[in-house]
């Protein structure tokens, strides 16, 4: 089979739609999205008009797109490279009907030629990903656990530290404060710490966004101390982000915010909630285990 690989910064509208379909079909077959939410959002965005010769999508924040087609032009596989990260981070998908045919190898070869030092995510625990990683000399450097818990009626009432009140997010007003606290809370985190006001606004435009599920813990002067952003997609609740200003840590604020969000999701008649946590963040894993969360799956990051 002839494999034709193309590499570019932006995508036409029709190609972006084709890639979105490939990603959806891959997710349905594997039971896990092959690329992160961030990549899926980037595919729908356009770069600033003044730097584009023609309108393209996905030409944002250092995104690069690798596309493999057969001789007849059928889309077989796709990889996204985030060149804005240091080192660059890649995610890829091979269509379920075209696996074990060298498409993944072709994509990883192109990625390693483009970025000799590289991180690659595998989101689906596919043994083929491990084989491919070994073949190219990658090592596992990070593991992200997806943990799940049943939503029940006996989550205790949150106990707020003295001087703290809780309110919900106001679009158009609170983005800057959330981004500031998030950057401090996740200074150590390679993805979450980079969240910008534009990233928050992109999520506000998504169908799942609901300010009633976005809790802000503020002091007497309405200064933000921490937040819990929840998410509901396809009937599954998510502890999307819990961020606490380091100056406000240690007083039980993180736990109170987590409980406020869990009680909100329970009130929406949902049966289950999920979250992502770094496997080596033992303190957080322990907190979530005490709340009834157990590991459901893992995302693995390989480094070359």
Residue ranges and their predicted role:
Residues 1-53, 159-193:
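Short amphipathic alpha-helix that is part of the acyltransferase structural core
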Residues 8-13, 23-115, 119, 225-237:
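Conserved donor-binding loop and adjoining core beta-sheet/short helix segment
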């Amino acid at each position: 089979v002839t494999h034709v690989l193309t590499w570019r910064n932006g995508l036409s509208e029709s190609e972006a739609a084709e890639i979105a379909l490939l990603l959806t079909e891959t997710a349905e077959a594997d039971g896990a999205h092959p690329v992160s939410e961030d990549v899926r959002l980037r595919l729908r965005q356009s770069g600033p008009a003044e730097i584009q010769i023609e309108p393209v999508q996905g030409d944002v924040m250092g995104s690069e797109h690798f596309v493999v087609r057969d001789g007849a032009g059928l889309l077989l596989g796709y990889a996204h490279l985030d060149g804005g990260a240091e080192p660059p981070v890649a995610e890829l998908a091979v269509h379920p009907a075209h696996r074990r045919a060298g498409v993944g190898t072709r994509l990883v070869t192109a990625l390693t030629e483009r970025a000799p030092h590289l991180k690659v995510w595998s989101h689906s625990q596919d043994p083929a990903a491990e084989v491919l990683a070994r073949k190219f000399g990658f090592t596992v450097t990070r593991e992200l656990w997806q943990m799940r818990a049943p939503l029940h009626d006996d989550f205790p009432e949150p106990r707020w530290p003295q001087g703290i009140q809780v309110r919900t997010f106001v679009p158009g007003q609170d983005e800057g404060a959330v981004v500031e606290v998030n950057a401090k809370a996740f200074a150590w985190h390679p993805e979450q710490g980079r969240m910008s006001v534009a990233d928050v606004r992109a999520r506000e435009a998504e169908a799942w966004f609901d300010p009633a599920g976005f809790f802000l813990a503020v002091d007497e002067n309405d200064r933000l101390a921490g937040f819990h952003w929840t998410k509901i997609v396809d009937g599954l609740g998510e502890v999307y982000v819990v961020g606490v200003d380091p100056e406000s840590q240690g007083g039980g604020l993180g736990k109170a915010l987590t409980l406020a969000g869990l009680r909100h999701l329970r009130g929406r008649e949902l049966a289950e909630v999920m979250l992502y946590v770094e496997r080596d963040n033992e303190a957080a894993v322990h907190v979530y285990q005490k709340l009834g969360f157990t590991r459901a799956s893992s995302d693995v990051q390989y480094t070359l």
